[in-house]
Amino acid sequence: MSRPIVISGPSGTGKSTLLKKLFAEYPDSFGFSVSSTTRTPRAGEVNGKDYNFVSVDEFKSMIKNNEFIEWAQFSGNYYGSTVASVKQVSKSGKTCILDIDMQGVKSVKAIPELNARFLFIAPPSVEDLKKRLEGRGTETEESINKRLSAAQAELAYAETGAHDKVIVNDDLDKAYKELKDFIFAEK
């Protein structure tokens, strides 16, 4: 089994865009660990593909049943990666990719038998990140402020050396090349 790859970084840094490019170019090499969440789907998101959308009661039941490798609560919503989702990717012969937050990274690091590799996607600046979040048109001012506050904590954590690699996404093509270089350096 190849080592899982954990990708994290503040909301709005381009993680989803980079991963969509990777999956489009290498559809048979990587599998996405589909996270579960209690938040409302955004326009265009598909249940079971982008996230597994569940109720708060369902999520809490999953916590009690130890179904998560990691889970966290952010902006009033729960997010988590299930053991079943990671196993499903591994059984398919693909490298598992987990897109998780800082709390999730800490949880996965506490499970050494996963032998995961950690990649952080950073914005060029907090100001640039704010522009990206505002440009989505899906965030309230309060939500943007919460995300920026969380981003500052995540950026500080990334500076501790908690990740194997940090990529600053100031140019999508350059960031994508760095992503591929990291992923294919050791499978």
Swiss-Prot record:
Keywords linked to the UniProt accession: Acetylation, ATP-binding, Kinase, Nucleotide-binding, Phosphoprotein, Transferase
Residues annotated to bind GMP: S35, R39, T40, P41, R42, Y51, E70, Y79, G80, S81, D101
Segments passing through the bilayer: none
Modified positions (N-acetylserine) in chain numbering: S2
Location of Phosphotyrosine modifications: Y157
GO molecular function (one): guanylate kinase activity
Residues the record lists as Phosphoserine modifications: S149
PANTHER family: GUANYLATE KINASE, GUANYLATE KINASE-RELATED
NCBIfam families: guanyl_kin
Assembly and binders: Monomer.
Extra information: Present with 20500 molecules/cell in log phase SD medium.
Official protein name in the record: Guanylate kinase
Biological classification of the source: Eukaryota, Fungi, Dikarya, Ascomycota, Saccharomycotina
Gene: GUK1
